Amino acid sequence: MAITYSIGDMLTKLRNASRVGHGSVDLKMSNMNKSILNILKEEGYIKDFNFLEKKGIAFIRVLLKYDNKRNPVINKIDAISTPGRKIYSSYRNMPRIKNGYGILIISSSQGVITGKEAKDKKIGGELICSVW
């Protein structure tokens, strides 16, 4: 079965792998996934990611991050927009995640950025996911 919604697939794999304590997880390569992972790395939710190829198919290997007690750093990661229901927001109406402790990832005219960056730059966009 072909995966048609790579963002949702990526978020589900990250959520499941971190809950069971895996050290890494392999995701299908896409530019959107790469942009989202860049933000997760900058914000400290994952250790790192690198690119690999299996049988001619490009993958991204994500190294997951845990605290000292081996609890996952990603407590919750949820998709907001889906292929059947796109949700957009202006910078004025950008929702706060966990009272400012989480992050919102959006796709804007200036690329994939966090909700905080969107407010600072005064641009809106499609709400992709929330992480805390």
Curated annotation (Swiss-Prot):
GO terms for biological process: translation. Coiled coil: none annotated. Pfam families: Ribosomal_S8. One of its GO terms (cellular component) is ribonucleoprotein complex. PROSITE patterns: RIBOSOMAL_S8. GO terms for molecular function: rRNA binding; structural constituent of ribosome. InterPro entries: Ribosomal_uS8 (IPR000630), Ribosomal_uS8_CS (IPR047863), Ribosomal_uS8_sf (IPR035987). Keywords: Ribonucleoprotein, Ribosomal protein, RNA-binding, rRNA-binding. NCBIfam families: PRK00136.1. One of the primary rRNA binding proteins, it binds directly to 16S rRNA central domain where it helps coordinate assembly of the platform of the 30S subunit. Belongs to the universal ribosomal protein uS8 family. Part of the 30S ribosomal subunit. Contacts proteins S5 and S12. This is Small ribosomal subunit protein uS8. The gene is rpsH.
